[in-house]
Curated annotation (Swiss-Prot):
<keyword id="KW-0812">Transmembrane</keyword>
<keyword id="KW-0813">Transport</keyword>
<dbReference type="InterPro" id="IPR003810">
    <property type="entry name" value="Mntp/YtaF"/>
</dbReference>
<keyword id="KW-1133">Transmembrane helix</keyword>
<keyword id="KW-0406">Ion transport</keyword>
<dbReference type="Pfam" id="PF02659">
    <property type="entry name" value="Mntp"/>
</dbReference>
<dbReference type="GO" id="GO:0005886">
    <property type="term" value="C:plasma membrane"/>
</dbReference>
<dbReference type="GO" id="GO:0005384">
    <property type="term" value="F:manganese ion transmembrane transporter activity"/>
</dbReference>
<keyword id="KW-0472">Membrane</keyword>
<feature type="transmembrane region" description="Helical">
    <location>
        <begin position="1"/>
        <end position="21"/>
    </location>
</feature>
<keyword id="KW-0464">Manganese</keyword>
<feature type="transmembrane region" description="Helical">
    <location>
        <begin position="34"/>
        <end position="54"/>
    </location>
</feature>
<comment type="similarity">
    <text>Belongs to the MntP (TC 9.B.29) family.</text>
</comment>
<feature type="transmembrane region" description="Helical">
    <location>
        <begin position="63"/>
        <end position="83"/>
    </location>
</feature>
<dbReference type="InterPro" id="IPR022929">
    <property type="entry name" value="Put_MntP"/>
</dbReference>
<feature type="transmembrane region" description="Helical">
    <location>
        <begin position="129"/>
        <end position="149"/>
    </location>
</feature>
<protein>
    <recommendedName>
        <fullName>Putative manganese efflux pump MntP</fullName>
    </recommendedName>
</protein>
Length: 180
């Protein structure tokens, strides 16, 4: 259960970072807009592992022998990508308006990692219900909290939290590989 919570926190870091930035840049963000960010980010993070699981289930029988290595490589790549993105994208500008199109695109972009985690769940034959619920709830909460933090503190912490998320994914990859 601790691994699922740590994974959920790691996956939520992209949405959290973006939420901090949105809180900082959208000076007049409304409460319902804050709720929409949480719903979209949490919803996509909840359902993308399911889509990844369905895709991963079709290939499970072919690669079950290599599952720990595949999980490790997927999580390592995702974690390294999160760290790389946090280092290279710190100068992005974010608009001061709310749009469903933008929040949808942001939710998709921040949940691609969750898709890969779903593939890993299929390879390792891990049940989806509880992990997906935890991932969605934690992302929902982190998104809302991130906007409030962004409103108070600005976007200073955004990239650092994304680095932490990448490190957690890499550590989970090693945990799976080593069989702990």
């Amino acid at each position: 259960m601790l691994s699922v919570i740590l994974l959920a926190i790691a996956l939520a870091m992209d949405a959290f970072s973006i939420s901090i930035t949105k809180g900082f840049t959208q000076k007049k963000i409304q409460k319902q807009e804050i709720l929409w960010y949480g719903i979209f980010f949490g919803g996509f993070q909840c359902f993308m592992p399911i889509i990844g699981y369905v895709c991963g289930t079709t290939i499970r029988s072919f690669i079950s022998t290599y599952a720990p290595w595949i999980a490790f490589i997927l999580l390592l790549c995702i974690g390294l990508n999160m760290i790389r993105e946090s280092i290279t994208s710190s100068d992005e500008k974010v608009a001061d308006i709310f749009s469903f199109k933008e929040v949808t695109l942001l939710a998709i972009a921040t949940s691609i990692d969750a898709f890969a985690v779903g593939v890993t769940f299929a390879i390792l034959n891990i049940s989806l219900v509880i992990p997906c619920a935890i991932i969605g709830i934690i992302t929902f909460l982190f998104s809302i909290v991130g906007i409030f933090i962004g409103k108070k503190l600005g976007d200073y912490f955004g990239d650092k939290f994304q680095i932490l998320g990448g490190v957690i994914l890499i550590l989970l990859g090693f945990k799976i590989l080593l069989g702990f």
